[in-house]
Amino acid sequence: MAAGLGSGNMDTTTQASFIPAIWGEKLNDFYRQELKAAAFFEDLSDEVVGGGNIIYIPNISQMTANTKTQGSAVTLNDQTSGKVTLTINTWKEVSFLVEDIVDAFWKKSYRMQEKFMKNAGYTVAKELEQALLNLCRGFSQTVGSSALALRDSNIRAAIAYLDSANVPENDRAFFLHPNVIWNQIQGINKFSLLTNTNGADPVLKGEVYKLYGIPVIKTSLLGTYLGHRDGMLAGRDALNFATSNLSGGMSGEGGVVRLQTQYVQEYLGTLVTADILFGVIENRDTSGVWIKAKSS
């Protein structure tokens, strides 16, 4: 065996000037919540392709059947029709400017401007998503409370509300926060035990994403309000939205987002702006249920 090294050998302290710190090829971008509400609820953007900022949605109520007697005139129905007003009045933008010196020094493999542009587009699209989800607080029908975990009885009560209002069964979805799904609902044997899921492992097979046959849309964008965690059960037509057709806008599940770049000689840099112009409205109150649960 070789003898131990004596003094005077090279080490990391004496050779520090020759040991580089490496910026790796990997870049940690922030995680993005999938935007799902705008893909589910009714999009009326086509109504304003030719211009306009207000969409009127007429309401039709059910007529009344009357008894007809011989020799008498029929009883006429005279409906008073109301309307829902959707106003496009929310304009959100995300902008940044990259000076030439910064662009020259950026590590090229990071493709930083492309990543920042993608982030800007996502951020403004998320504003529409958040606005739609926040509308759940306007539903007059509610179940649950801030003090208790969401229970099976709350879920059934929410479904009963929509059934009583004759909301189409094939156009419904639950919107729930991950904490409510995994910390509360999955603690209910009916929804988690293998024996209660037709032999399919609910975790591996994704059965957690249906409650009584109704799809569950999981989103971390559902906030807390007055101490409880927001959630909802809604029909597709419960909420409506529209995005204005901004020149150069690109359609997607997050609505129409416009992304622009311009070289600004005054600052010797490239200005990038992502923006969206939209409006949201509760269209059918009886087609939605505000679900409240404890926040954790």
PLM regions: where:
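Short secondary-structure boundary segments
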Residues: 1-18, 60-67, 116-134
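Sequence/fold signature of self-assembling virion shell proteins
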Residues: 2-44, 48-51, 58-62, 85-89, ...
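Generic alpha-helical secondary structure signal
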Residues: 21, 25, 110-111, 149, ...
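Charge-rich, low-complexity amphipathic helices
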Residues: 44-45, 49-53, 57, 79, ...
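Long, contiguous amphipathic alpha-helices that act as assembly "spine/axial" helices in icosahedral shell
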Residues: 57-59, 81-144, 166-176, 216, ...
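Active-site-surrounding "flap" and adjacent substrate/cofactor-binding loops of secreted or lumenal enzymes
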Residues: 62-65, 70-83
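Residue-level detector of alpha-helical recognition elements and their boundaries
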Residues: 72, 134-135, 287
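Extended, solvent-exposed, turn-rich assembly/linker loops in the middle of proteins
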Residues: 137-209
